[in-house]
Amino acid sequence: MSIPAELKYSKTHEWIRIEGDEAVIGITHFAQEQLGDLTFVDLPGVGDTLDVEQEMGSVESVKAASELYAPVAGEVIAVNDALASAPELVNQSPYTEGWMLRVKLAATPEDLLDATAYGELVASEAH
């Protein structure tokens, strides 16, 4: 399973790529694998404000529906509009084409996991 070392992760299986004072957010390979083929992605709008651990949207798949939680606080400055008509991008390419949001950070993110710690979390949940 792919767990890119350059990213940070949340305990609720979102990935975060920090780019200066912005962050790009999506769900991890493990999360999309557990959900199965996505059929719908509901995301906040540009200009919405997120707080850490606040529900920020949801995804629906052939297996289940699941909430998405904000791993960082800030203002949504971009949304991946392609997911509205092609939610399968999250399954096909969770770390690149399947990104979900770009956020202007309100503060330096805390309590995020590095790739090693996230790998340990996934291993503990997979059993």
Curated annotation (Swiss-Prot):
<dbReference type="GO" id="GO:0005960">
    <property type="term" value="C:glycine cleavage complex"/>
</dbReference>
<protein>
    <recommendedName>
        <fullName>Glycine cleavage system H protein</fullName>
    </recommendedName>
</protein>
<dbReference type="GO" id="GO:0019464">
    <property type="term" value="P:glycine decarboxylation via glycine cleavage system"/>
</dbReference>
<comment type="similarity">
    <text>Belongs to the GcvH family.</text>
</comment>
<feature type="modified residue" description="N6-lipoyllysine">
    <location>
        <position position="63"/>
    </location>
</feature>
<keyword id="KW-0450">Lipoyl</keyword>
<dbReference type="InterPro" id="IPR033753">
    <property type="entry name" value="GCV_H/Fam206"/>
</dbReference>
<dbReference type="InterPro" id="IPR011053">
    <property type="entry name" value="Single_hybrid_motif"/>
</dbReference>
<comment type="subunit">
    <text>The glycine cleavage system is composed of four proteins: P, T, L and H.</text>
</comment>
<dbReference type="InterPro" id="IPR017453">
    <property type="entry name" value="GCV_H_sub"/>
</dbReference>
<dbReference type="InterPro" id="IPR003016">
    <property type="entry name" value="2-oxoA_DH_lipoyl-BS"/>
</dbReference>
<dbReference type="Pfam" id="PF01597">
    <property type="entry name" value="GCV_H"/>
</dbReference>
<dbReference type="GO" id="GO:0005829">
    <property type="term" value="C:cytosol"/>
</dbReference>
<comment type="function">
    <text>The glycine cleavage system catalyzes the degradation of glycine. The H protein shuttles the methylamine group of glycine from the P protein to the T protein.</text>
</comment>
<feature type="domain" description="Lipoyl-binding">
    <location>
        <begin position="22"/>
        <end position="104"/>
    </location>
</feature>
<dbReference type="InterPro" id="IPR002930">
    <property type="entry name" value="GCV_H"/>
</dbReference>
<dbReference type="InterPro" id="IPR000089">
    <property type="entry name" value="Biotin_lipoyl"/>
</dbReference>
